[in-house]
Amino acid sequence: MTKKMFLKNEKVYREQTWNVVVGCSRVSAGCDNCYAIPECQRMSGNPKITQKHGVNPYDKLVQIRNGKTDFSSKLHFFEDRLSTPLRVKRPTIWFVNSLSDMYHHGVSLDVLKRIFEVMNRADWHIFDILTKRADRMEELSDKLTWTPNIWQGVTFEGIPADMPDGQRKKVLSRISALREHPANVKFVSFEPLIGAIPPDLDLTGIDWAFFGGESHRTILQARPMEPQWLRDGIALCESFGCKPYVKQLGTAWAAATGNWRFKDKAGKDSLPWPEDLCPYAIHSLREITPDDLRPMVAQPSLGDPPSSNCGHADTPEG
């Protein structure tokens, strides 16, 4: 069957995050500087959340371990947020669970089915799901309903030289699991790109990918992205007909080039980028349009809401 796209060309989408589940735990090197940890810690001190829920659900999501703040491996399901996309009539690109992982073992199949039911019904929206837990993604794929408006992605942070063999195999397996996945549109996040991308990585059937260097509030803690890793990744994508985008060059690059001083702490401003990378810069997810994907994806018109290249990217990280 021909793959189907759900977008109408005339739609103008906005972007939102739908954090119906929050909380996580580390699975690979790409998690080491995860922005969700300080964000959950920040939210735990928000009095408005405490006032609304009686207690602050974020309080239990992080803990101090070996003198550092880390995930506690506990999760929280915000049932009151479940219907949010159904109440939003304007077509929106929703990044699902930016402070968690949809396929974390703490997210029950029952909760997953309820989340998918909302996404299935809200077919005037796009839902981007990004995971590092491709094994559970694969295990549950036939137990969930994959309407064309649900895009599935995996994170591939590259293969650092010091990555243990067991972790290396798991990271590589994410791509093979995604290739076989039934989602209508499939994508890869090469962010944070902290190691080389194997030249024999098979991206058959992957529709698009975005690349990004690691961002961090502290210059010395941000791991650098080698420009050659990025160039090799772009060339690999193009060889498979996978549309590549570049989100940012990372904090280490911004510091090395002096852009840190100009508040571009993640290397998102593409004006000072190497010239060959500028054409791949993405301003936002809204730029990933049917026109971009048309060579790969056929596109009938689907749901409407019920009545009642150089710059800064707002794509999800890692």
What does each model-identified segment do?
Residues 76-247, 254-255:
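Conserved AdoMet/S-adenosylmethionine-binding subsite of the radical SAM
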Residues 34, 40, 47-50, 110-112, ...:
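Generic preference for flexible, low-structure residues
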